[in-house]
C-alpha cells in the first residue's frame, strides 16, 4: 500500500469552515425616480442598482427600466384605476429621468364595466404625434338605456356599432395627430378623449363608460436630452435635474365640455 498524504483532506483546508457571507446590498446604490412635469407628484419612488464596477456602469443598467405607477400616486388623487408606464431615459446624478411609455386600465375596473344586456364596442388605431412618437390607442365604450326606455336590454345594431367605432377612431386620430406627446399625456390624465367620444356618439346610440383603455408605445424618435429636460421642467442648458417635487395640475374635471362637432 502506497504511503502518502490524503489529498482530499488537505485540499479543502479546515473541514466545515463557513464561507464568508457578503451582504449583496453593500454593493448597491439607491436612485430617485422622477416623473415628468405633467404629473403633480414628481418623486415617485426609489430604485436599487449595483454600483459602477469596471466597465459595468450603474447608469447603463438603469436606462430602459419601466416603472408602472398608479395615476392616484402621480396626481395625489382618489381615482386609481389608470396605470401609467414610465421608462428611464437618462440618469443625472442620483435621479432617473423618466418619460411616458404607455397607459393601461386596472383589471378590476375593466371587469366591473363588462355587464349583461348591453353592447361592448372596441376600437384601436395607430397614430403618430407631432414630435414623432408612434402610439397605438385602444378605446372601449358601452351602450346604455335611453331616458324613457322600458326594455331591459340596450343592444346596438351592427350598423350603429360600426358608426360608433368609426367615430372613435376619428376622434382618437384627431386628438393625437395634432398634438405632441406632452399634450397627449395631458389629455390622457383626465381622459378627455373618452368624454369627447361619448358626446360625439350620443346621436348614434347613448354610451357610458367610454375610456381610452390602453396606450402602447410602438416607435420613438431618436433620444434628445434637451427635450427630456423640457419634459422635466428644466431648460436644455441646465445640467442638474433635481426639479420641483410637484408638477402642473391638469384641470379638466367631470364638468369638462368637449368642443362642438361641426358634423356628426
Curated annotation (Swiss-Prot):
The modification Phosphotyrosine is found at residue 256. Component of the small ribosomal subunit. The ribosome is a large ribonucleoprotein complex responsible for the synthesis of proteins in the cell. Part of the small subunit (SSU) processome, first precursor of the small eukaryotic ribosomal subunit. During the assembly of the SSU processome in the nucleolus, many ribosome biogenesis factors, an RNA chaperone and ribosomal proteins associate with the nascent pre-rRNA and work in concert to generate RNA folding, modifications, rearrangements and cleavage as well as targeted degradation of pre-ribosomal RNA by the RNA exosome. The modification ADP-ribosyltyrosine is found at residue 155. It is found in: Cytoplasm; Nucleus; Nucleus, Nucleolus. This is Small ribosomal subunit protein eS1. GO terms for molecular function: structural constituent of ribosome. Keywords: Acetylation, ADP-ribosylation, Cytoplasm, Differentiation, Isopeptide bond, Nucleus, Phosphoprotein, Ribonucleoprotein, Ribosomal protein, Ubl conjugation. The modification Phosphoserine is found at residues 236-237, 263. The gene is RPS3A. It comes from the Eukaryota. Residues 232-264 are annotated as: Disordered. Residues 242-255 have a biased composition (Basic and acidic residues). One of its GO terms (biological process) is cell differentiation. Belongs to the eukaryotic ribosomal protein eS1 family. One of its GO terms (cellular component) is cytosolic small ribosomal subunit.
Amino acid at each position: 500500500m502506497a504511503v502518502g498524504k490524503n489529498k482530499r483532506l488537505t485540499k479543502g483546508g479546515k473541514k466545515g469552515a463557513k464561507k464568508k457571507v457578503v451582504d449583496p446590498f453593500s454593493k448597491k446604490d439607491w436612485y430617485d425616480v422622477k416623473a415628468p412635469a405633467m404629473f403633480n407628484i414628481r418623486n415617485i419612488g426609489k430604485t436599487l442598482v449595483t454600483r459602477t464596477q469596471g466597465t459595468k456602469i450603474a447608469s447603463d443598467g438603469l436606462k430602459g427600466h419601466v416603472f408602472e405607477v398608479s395615476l392616484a400616486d402621480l396626481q395625489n388623487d382618489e381615482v386609481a384605476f389608470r396605470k401609467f408606464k414610465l421608462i428611464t431615459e437618462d440618469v443625472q446624478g442620483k435621479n432617473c429621468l423618466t418619460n411616458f411609455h404607455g397607459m393601461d386600465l386596472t383589471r378590476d375596473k375593466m371587469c366591473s364595466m363588462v355587464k349583461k344586456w348591453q353592447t361592448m364596442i372596441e376600437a384601436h388605431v395607430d397614430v403618430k404625434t407631432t414630435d414623432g412618437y408612434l402610439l397605438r390607442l385602444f378605446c372601449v365604450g358601452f351602450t346604455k338605456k335611453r331616458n324613457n326606455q322600458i326594455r331591459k336590454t340596450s343592444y346596438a345594431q351592427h350598423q350603429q356599432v360600426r358608426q360608433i367605432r368609426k367615430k372613435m377612431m376619428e376622434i382618437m386620430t384627431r386628438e393625437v395627430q395634432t398634438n405632441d406627446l406632452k399634450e397627449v399625456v395631458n389629455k390622457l390624465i383626465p381622459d378627455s378623449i373618452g368624454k369627447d367620444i361619448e358626446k360625439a356618439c350620443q346621436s348614434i346610440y347613448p354610451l357610458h363608460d367610454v375610456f381610452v383603455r390602453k396606450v402602447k408605445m410602438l416607435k420613438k424618435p431618436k433620444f434628445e436630452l434637451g427635450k427630456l429636460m423640457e419634459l422635466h421642467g428644466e431648460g436644455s442648458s441646465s445640467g442638474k435635474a433635481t426639479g420641483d417635487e410637484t408638477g402642473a395640475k391638469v384641470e379638466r374635471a367631470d364638468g369638462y365640455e368637449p368642443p362642438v362637432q361641426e358634423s356628426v
